[in-house]
Amino acid sequence: MTKEGMLSAAGRRFSRCAPSPRPRRNYALANIPPPAAVHIRTNDMISPEERRFLEAAELGNKPTLQECLDYDGDRRLNVNCLDSMGRTALEIAVDNENMEVVELLLQQPDIRIGNALLCAIREGVYRLVEVLVNHPNITREMLGDGWSQALDPSEAASAEYSSDISPVILAAQLNQFEILQMLIRKDASIEKPHRHSCICETCDRERLNDSLQYSLKRINTFRALASPAWMSLTSPDPILSAFKLSWDLQRLAFEEHEFKETYLQLSEQCKQYSCDLLSQCRSSEEVIAILNKDGNVNDDNIDVWASKLSLSRLKLAIKYEQKAFVSHPHCQQLLTSIWYEGIPYRQRSGTWANFFLYAFLLFLWPIFCLMYILMPKSRLGRLVRSPFMKFFYYSVSFATFLGLLTWATFEDYRYEKGERGGMTRASDRGPPATWVESLVFTWVIGMLWSEIKQLWEEGFKRYMRQWWNWLDFLMICLYLCTISIRLSAYYIFTYREDPYRYTVRTYWTSEEPMLVAEALFAVGNVFSFARIIYLFQTNPYLGPLQISLGCMLVDVAKFCFIFVLIISSFSIGLAQLYWYYDPNTDVCLPGATCKHSSNVFSSIADSYLTLLWSLFSITKPEDTDVVENHKITQWVGQGMFIMYHCTSIIVLLNMLIAMMSHSFQIINDHADLEWKFHRTKLWMAHFDEGSSLPPPFNIIVTPKSLIYVMNCLFNTVRWLLGKYTYQKNRNRATIRRPGYSRKRNEMEKSGGHDDDSLKPLTYADIITRLVARFIHQTKKDMKMDGVNEDDLHEIKQDISSLRYELRDDRRREIVRSSSHIDAVKRDIMRTMSTTSRRPYGGSMRLPKTRPSVAEESEEDDKSDETSSTDEEADETRSRKSSVLYIPPVNSTLPGIISEEAPVKKSTKRRASEADSKLPDRPLSDTYTSSFTPKLLPVFAQPPHSALRKTDTSMSFPINGTALDTSIVKPPRGVLRASQENLPAVELIETLKKEMNEKLDRLISGISENVKSPSPASHSHVGFNVEK
């Protein structure tokens, strides 16, 4: 079938098809390609002039670039043209770090700089950024918040950076310290975004306009604010700024779930920055200044040398959960020094020495406490007041309390006689307290007073943030309820005659006060023994396990929420299925004996208990059977019971195990960090002064307490009279500084602060040092990263640009040297012809048909400048007209091209370093084998011949004899020989003879080169031979 027939058949089939609601064009039949889905700019869309312009910018070819900019054709070149990747020539030059090309492009009036400035900041070249920022097109507003409004629409659609990334934001994100500091000096700033729930007009407009763009703008801004460079250069207190910003970002991670990982990464970046600053501390004084800073008081210039510490910054770090900062070795070293203050040899002692020390302190515990009550300011009192001793004696006191609870639990009441003979104590409905219970009551009162003091000192919010305080609160409440009920029962049955006071417990009701009190006491004992786990945090082996247990309890709580939903659904379903079958009645079937029903799902409460105990295999499978012949009920009940077991045991319990394993693995991976953080929280509770005595000694009224009470009453009276103001700041300095006495003695012996190491330090001075060290360390780490792909690309671009520069310099040097030597040769020949015509006496003025040597050189330079673009023509001309000039051995001609020629500025190049070498041919007899070609100077200014017409005389000696100006005084432009000066005429004759010999040799050499040409002579410089 022919092509026309196939097309007609296809057309008929197409016409029989059902009409489409949206007709489509058949590109296959029309042989027309479908339109492109994505329009990508290719090299075919770029004009030849623009392509040449962009390639010159890419390769660093400055002459070609200048030629493209100077070209004035039919259509002016667009300096903002784009390549296939959407980059302008300025962006390409900045990306290649070609400063000369950038300066050349910036001279153009309509150049666009926007994205090029961002590229320069990305490359981190300070000089490029400085040149671009100082351009008139860049204003102060464009560097900060006004960047997106000032951008050109074509630049705003850049494929690399969005319009909301300003130069200062990009410099901060990349941690370019020098560039960011330069932008800050030009008043560039970053505005912190509003909170996520802000309902202002600006936020609502941006959110409704484009919610994604609004969120990305916030993230880019927070990336800049969270950068170490921005916080180091703009914040007076970088550590406090890092704490607050980290906390805000952590809250945003749970508010904007879509970008949770991004915000968490930025939060970790802020935490790491604060740790890096703390790592720069080099002495304990600097660490103390950092940890003792109070963010609520402007005390940057207050002396950090103080006998008391508050550790306000450390408390703030614990509040903001800066675990890495708190667990830092510098911080832990200071805390350890404070913790063991007064017991300096404890850390360096062995195991047995510490054991005997603890035993000694244990047995002297009551004596030390009583001595502290009597003499709180003595040396022994200071020892008892130390943090370690307070914790140790609190642990001893709590262990004693647990021992009393155990004793009270195992006390046998059933065989003790009551107040009335014949009745046991167990049957007394209002028994009095025993001496063990009285001691427990005393301990509970002491623990209650300790918690009240802690609540007063820390504040309600800080007290409630610690979960162990919740446990203490519940434990004390249970014991107080037990004591209250016991006292009430004793009062009721002691002061009121009741014949049923001594009754066997079998006849007691469930609401009996003693039964309620014993139940509460039992629960309180459970919490009391669980409280001892809190003390494990000081141990490096048990501490991580205790922390893992706390995380697992959170997982159990999550599991219980899901498990309650599952067990409730099955309990309600089974109760609905078995509600009719009462387990308390016997069922009698016809022709069978009566059977007792064992229905365990008759109510919702029974269903809950049955399903709960079934997890531990206590229930039986027969519990779903019924006595009646109701198979459908029995089958459905068995199916639901099986589904419950599969869901709860196979799925939920294994999920709980996996969750607990995951939590334990997280803690185990960061065991040291988590343990040190929680240990620090325990230590901080014992650092502050107060609560020095453990229960029950803390309820004893001491003389110090009486003085404090009287002082408080006196201040209250003064406050009522308006003569006293209470300070609301709770972060008062109460912690003793380790080694302060020794340091103070050293300062007194040194006679003041002459020594720099003993001078008082302020927080502002120390934070300035730390920031400077951090910046230096960061830059050092960046330099040690090694060579990457970008560095290799930059080296390649530098080599390419240098190659073009060397090629241009070489071409100019060849043309300039050739023209200069030709002019020298013509001057010499003109001089010889003049002297041959009038050898004796008189003078003859030559017709000035050619310019002088200097003028010829200047004209040659001008011609070189105009013809520099045509490289091949210059090389061809130099190849045809140049030979290497080698002077003879016995020649006394001055060093026209020698190294000793006086020049102002020259760049020397050996003739042998040209593109090709000399041809291997034998030299003439007049040449010597030890001869080395002279270096050819490149004159910075228009060159002049060493042998030239001057206003005075010849500037070189001839045969070792210099011409005196008194002998030869030619006028300007004329070579004169006087008849009276015969020695001068003889010298000219000698010069003429030597020149003739030299020309003969040159002609012979040129003839040999013509007969056997070699490519190696193309780059040699010599006299041009005119045929």
From Swiss-Prot:
The keyword Repeat applies. Residues 1008-1017 have a biased composition (Polar residues). The chain crosses the membrane at residues 355-375, 391-411, 473-493, 516-536, 559-579, 640-660. One of its GO terms (cellular component) is cation channel complex. Residues 1-22, 825-929, 1008-1027 are annotated as: Disordered. It is a multi-pass membrane protein. It is found in: Membrane. Residues 910-923 have a biased composition (Basic and acidic residues). InterPro entries: Ankyrin_rpt, Ankyrin_rpt-contain_sf, Ion_trans_dom, TRP_dom, TRPC_channel. This is Transient-receptor-potential-like protein. It comes from Caenorhabditis elegans.
